[in-house]
From Swiss-Prot:
The protein, known as: Outer-membrane lipoprotein LolB
Subcellular location, record wording: Cell outer membrane
Lipid anchor positions (S-diacylglycerol cysteine): 22
Covalent lipidation (N-palmitoyl cysteine), chain numbering: 22
Membrane-topology annotation of the record: Lipid-anchor
């Protein structure tokens, strides 16, 4: 019995140390606030990207239709860009060319349409609701006209919520390409009332 008691008392200090170790607070790391200098620096680098190209996979999913395509996005200035959607065989399904004050859309039959509102035109002709004006910035990892967003531990966009005219879009940034500087999104998903748009960027070219 005495032997057992001594053994028991010897274990007490060790048990106390283990309990104390379990209560030591763990550092949560640096705050990733939208006002942090690291985010401001990253944001400024993205805003300076006036010309770029990216290509990859596009998916539009809703109760009414499902569209899968390859896409090519070419931006030559903040107000000039081209969006090309092609099918698995490489044939053009849709080409959108946007310039200040005028937008031209060419469908898979070669018919051309002109408008001053690219988002409205693409919705009327294809049935797809794509927030093009905002997507121009979201695709780069910029929040655009919303201040409702969170950052990941690398001070990049993680999630944003954008509301306009009673419509709410939620954008989730799922992966980034760190082979380019600054790092740019490689996978993101847009959600709006049962509609989903998935983009997977296979490559980026910064000019």
């Amino acid at each position: 019995m005495p032997m057992r008691k001594r053994h028991f008392y010897r274990l007490l200090p060790l048990a106390s140390l283990l309990l104390a170790a379990c209560t030591i607070p763990v550092s949560k790391g640096p705050a990733t606030s939208p006002t942090s200098p690291q985010w401001r620096q990253h944001e400024q680098q993205l805003q300076q990207l006036g010309q770029f190209e990216t290509r990859g996979a596009f998916a539009y999913l809703s109760d009414k239709q499902k569209v899968y395509a390859r896409f090519f996005w070419q931006q030559t200035s903040p107000e000039r860009y081209r969006l090309l959607l092609t099918n698995p065989l490489g044939s053009t399904e849709l080409e959108l060319v946007v310039q200040p004050g005028v937008t031209q859309l060419t469908d898979n039959q070669g018919k051309r349409y002109v408008s001053d509102d690219p988002q409205e035109m693409i919705q009327k002709l294809t049935g797809m609701s794509i927030p093009l004006e905002s997507l121009r910035q979201w695709i780069l990892g910029l929040p655009g006209d919303t201040s409702d967003f969170t950052l990941d531990d690398k001070y990049r966009l993680k999630k944003l919520t954008y509301q306009q005219n009673g419509v709410t879009w939620v954008v989730d940034y799922q992966e980034y390409n760190t082979q380019v500087t600054p790092s740019l999104p490689s996978r993101l998903e847009l959600n709006q009332d049962g509609q989903r748009i998935k983009l997977k960027m296979d490559s980026w070219t910064i000019k």
